[in-house]
From Swiss-Prot:
Pfam families: Ribosomal_L31e. The gene is rpl31e. GO terms for biological process: cytoplasmic translation. Transmembrane segments: none annotated. This is Large ribosomal subunit protein eL31. The keyword Ribonucleoprotein applies.
Amino acid sequence: MRMIKPGEEVIFTVPIRKVKKIVPRWKRAPRAVKFVREFIARHAKAQEVIISTKVNEKIWERGIEKPPSKLRVKVRVEEEEREGGKVRIAYVDLA
């Protein structure tokens, strides 16, 4: 897959079902949020991932034990100048 350019928006389908199989019921929603963060960081090649409150609420909608099996999200990547150089930041919102 090609690298996402800064300012570009891409839609991803995050397969949360993978998490549901290996995590105890009472940890599923928090682990799903972490999985979304890791998935987007890996695919968008971003150092930081900022998840919107809408995405968080969608994951927690049915409680801690039953997050959705998959989630369609819109990702926008920006580059920012910091002390250590350029940093890629991915902003995640519902698609």
